[in-house]
Amino acid sequence: MSNGSNDWGVSYSRIAWLEDAIQNHDNVVNYNRHDDIIMEFDRRDGSSIVLICLDEYALGEAAVHRVLKEFPTVNYISVGGNWNGYTEEAKQLCLSKNIGLFNSSELTGALWKDEFWAYHQRDKDGNPIYPYKKERAA
């Protein structure tokens, strides 16, 4: 475990916040962190999650491909706080690969779902809502 730097520019405060949220979640057991931003844990049903902690305002499809190239076992991508999100294309790519893609507002609900990658919040009428963002021009 490191509290140093990582190639994704994720600050220690972002990592520490997510680490605390995961370790204190009632459905999480056997927690371990490595490579600074990778969190591995089991859920009470025995299923395993390999989560990458990011801090991306608008995570796009290219970044999902980068995650999977660098960390092929990742099955949960956390993009950061409530103000962060992802593009619709990134979400569709993750859904097609059974990979969870969420910001912090979606975190706790997803960890309770058997098919966590398919979790979504709903509006007052029961429609799915997602924190979609437009990718910033590079």
Locate predicted features.
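Phospho-regulatory, Ser/Thr- and acidic-rich intrinsically disordered linkers and terminal tails
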Residues: 33-38, 47-52, 121-138
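Short beta-alpha junction loops
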Residues: 79-85, 105-110
